[in-house]
Amino acid sequence: MAVYTDINEIELGAFLRHYDIGTLTSYKGIAEGVENSNYLLHTSSGSFILTLYEKRTNREDLPFFLGLMQHLAKRGLECPQPVVRNDGAMIGQLAGRPAAIVTFLEGMWMRRPTVAHCEAVGEGLAHMHLAGADFPMRRRNGLTLPDWRPLWNLSRKCADTVERGLVAETEADLDFLEKNWPADLPQGVIHADLFPDNAFFLGDRLSGFIDFYFACTDILAYDVAVCLNAWCFEKDFSYNRTKGAALLRGYTSVRPLSEAEANALLVLARGAAVRFMLTRLYDWLTVPAGSFVVKKDPMEYVRRMRFHRQIESGAEYGLEMQGVAA
């Protein structure tokens, strides 16, 4: 979460008159994040999150994102729930931006996730996949295999200034992924960005997921692969197999992977590393200093890419055979 668009109390008060959430007592910007502007609201009825959607978020996608949160909450998944306006809509306009209010989710994200946190996230992700199975809307993943080569071409010319040899490495990975990307795996609603800062905990207990603004319809096991990249590498870039095994055990205890999904895990994990390297690399090379967009080091994911090239089976990530459906 972040703040890119400032709002004042007068315009916020006018906006809140369209909601039945009590009287505003205080509000403050939330500094973390990269995509949209977020504020924590305190009212006489409780706490809420106000989001102003910035240019990177397509307004046409908002009904999918908000509808998904509404659907998942109704299915018992802990996540922010959109607050419906007095006119029945979920989206309004504030400071020239589309804006929405969602309920506040208790908890905090873990900067140093433990094995228990990884297992809880895996279990929660599987519950999310099952809860989203009957969600009627679809949204194409705008950052999947067909999109990686065009995105890479925007950065390719300068990539070797970040790391010598990165052009050759990335070209080889893209060639491999384009030849080996799996077809006909189970698909459904995925989070697609379930990093530690998008999962809240109360102690070791998962209290819920947030930030569904990359959610889309895609391969379910790809979501697992994103989590292996996001949760199971240490600060020195080594892969923690114990955390990986816990995350996979948590997931497969709720939704066992098919044999085809298990066999594809190393390709999916390699692809997920490339996806996040490419978006980080693009921002690293193109976003000017002082911009509101928070740049993240692409080399963290280059090192993950190198690790995945050495993997020969899902077992090396910690996948146990009892987690694979017969």
UniProtKB/Swiss-Prot annotation:
GO terms for biological process: threonine biosynthetic process. It is an enzyme of class 2 (transferase). It holds the Pfam family APH. Keywords: Amino-acid biosynthesis, ATP-binding, Kinase, Nucleotide-binding, Threonine biosynthesis, Transferase. Pathway: Amino-acid biosynthesis; L-threonine biosynthesis; L-threonine from L-aspartate: step 4/5. Signal peptide: none annotated. Its EC number is 2.7.1.39. SUPFAM superfamilies: Protein kinase-like (PK-like) (SSF56112). It catalyses: L-homoserine + ATP = O-phospho-L-homoserine + ADP + H(+). GO terms for molecular function: ATP binding; homoserine kinase activity. Belongs to the pseudomonas-type ThrB family. This is Homoserine kinase. The gene is thrB.
